[in-house]
């Protein structure tokens, strides 16, 4: 580089530095507004170009993956509602499916609106297999149309897949009830689709809606009715993941303690194949919110729907979103859908179905207080069982009248229980007493006792109903909250359970006044009520209140019956019968021989002979 070039470059550098230095120190006379006006369009154009490029790329990707369904992958979400006196069903053009279901006449434990179905905690998909990628029909966008069919409301969602091919979802809701009819149709596809069933996958993160979240968690499961094996359900309290693969199923139901969401084929059809799953307690579904306070369990039902029915337009299904009410579920046109309401074992279920529920519903139609209804129910049951109670009391009174003879036997034989029992049987025979006559009436009352044990925990009518300090008769009454947890008892005090325990102890004391039971067995009868105090502390307040009232009525009944039974006169009658039997007097016919007593005598004689034989061997 020569001398002139060096000088030229140096001058240019000095001039440029001076220019930039001067410009940077100048204050503009007016605010600079030009740059935003110039640069904004540039930024907007950039964004638009990027957006257009993204849309183009997305459309191209959708076209490659979904073919004719690509156009339906984009759209605008719009809501439609189906409403009757019981439910509000919200539908969306995004997916052409159910967005939420509100039960109008029920509320959560904290008095909020009860949404039995919400998209936030329900993952619902309907997979259609195509020659390209499987398509989730509930991810497409549809056009919605509202219409009427008599007193029924109808919403139809339809999307165009090109070349005359359409997918159509139709939802119908009657003027009342909790059932939503659902029709699915795929038209114009001809033989383009592979002959594979559609898969409806329903995953629910069960939300807490009951006060007692532990009982609600235990009672949440998947119920189903199979054509061959009948009704069954996944283990409710299992700590492991429970899964069953089923065939020919009438319906599946994601059941909670007092409500259920079900799916079934209309007109008596069956689901060819289904897989149901109950996830462990406190578990969550994939992509579901994790909140142990809000969500209590995770359930899933995956059903296979024949493609042929969808293509032919004969795919007629239905959803049920409602209470576990026996009468309501019985009216659902699905095979034995009332099985979602647990009424107990066969005999107990029969009593609840044909006796308890009709009587309870009848009382409910007359009285508004459920406390009063329970009291009247107790009185009616005790009135029906009065003959059995009277017979049981008289039998115990007879046994007590023989106490002098029985005491003599104990003094005579000491600790030789076998000898005592043998002679006791002879005494009973002489006096014409069947020692089991007092037990049989009690045993006959057991089915009713068990019926109540199954009825009250599952009676949705008691849900949210208050009585005195109990705010919800379907849950335990928390009279006091303990600052600690007692093993097998809990951290709360149920006053109705405490009253039930005290009344049971009182009844036991009254009953022991006419009982011949002595020794450890007598004191054991006082231990059982204490056990029930622990067992029933977390059971529904309605059940504990029923047992409490039942005990009070039974005590009063015992005291009244005692006034009409003259124990002295009863003793004279027994002695007369003994004298008659010992004299061989058969006037009026020989006494009937009790087969059971005869068998007991024979068994005791055989046992005595065996023991005598063993003693003889030892002596040798």
Swiss-Prot record:
One of its GO terms (cellular component) is plasma membrane. It is a multi-pass membrane protein. The keyword Membrane applies. One of its GO terms (biological process) is protein insertion into membrane. GO terms for molecular function: membrane insertase activity. Pfam families: 60KD_IMP (PF02096), YidC_periplas (PF14849). It is found in: Cell inner membrane. Keywords: Cell inner membrane, Cell membrane, Chaperone, Membrane, Protein transport, Transmembrane, Transmembrane helix, Transport. Its main location: membrane. Belongs to the OXA1/ALB3/YidC family. Type 1 subfamily. HAMAP family: YidC_type1 (MF_01810). NCBIfam families: PRK01318.2-3, yidC_nterm, yidC_oxa1_cterm. Required for the insertion and/or proper folding and/or complex formation of integral membrane proteins into the membrane. Involved in integration of membrane proteins that insert both dependently and independently of the Sec translocase complex, as well as at least some lipoproteins. Aids folding of multispanning membrane proteins. Interacts with the Sec translocase complex via SecD. Specifically interacts with transmembrane segments of nascent integral membrane proteins during membrane integration. This is Membrane protein insertase YidC. It comes from Cytophaga hutchinsonii (strain ATCC 33406 / DSM 1761 / CIP 103989 / NBRC 15051 / NCIMB 9469 / D465). The gene is yidC.
